[in-house]
């Protein structure tokens, strides 16, 4: 269900500012977006998986806060 190490490295490579940039807001938002997409696909198959649904809501909230932070910084 979680992103594999290779998937995460590819997302980091595409969105990073420098070689080992894993903590910038853009990278965090990109990783959360991929996880949200994956969880959404899982919930289409398993609509009564409430534990995953809560995780989806939490990831959405975290991404929303990061996007808001990024908008205020730029």
Curated annotation (Swiss-Prot):
Top-level taxonomic group: Bacteria
Record-linked Pfam families: Ribosomal_S15 (PF00312)
GO biological process per UniProt: translation
CDD domains for this protein: Ribosomal_S15p_S13e (cd00353)
Single GO MF annotation: rRNA binding
Subunit structure: Part of the 30S ribosomal subunit. Forms a bridge to the 50S subunit in the 70S ribosome, contacting the 23S rRNA.
NCBIfam families to which the protein is assigned, alphabetical: S15_bact
Protein name (database record): Small ribosomal subunit protein uS15
Lineage: Bacteria, Bacillati, Mycoplasmatota, Mollicutes, Acholeplasmatales
Gene label: rpsO
């Amino acid at each position: 269900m979680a992103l594999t190490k290779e998937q995460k490295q590819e997302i980091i490579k595409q969105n990073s500012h420098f070689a080992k940039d894993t903590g910038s807001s853009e990278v965090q938002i990109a990783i959360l977006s991929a996880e949200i997409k994956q969880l959404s696909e899982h919930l289409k198959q398993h609509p009564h998986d409430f534990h995953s649904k809560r995780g989806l809501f939490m990831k959405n909230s975290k991404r929303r806060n990061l996007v808001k932070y990024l908008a205020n910084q730029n």
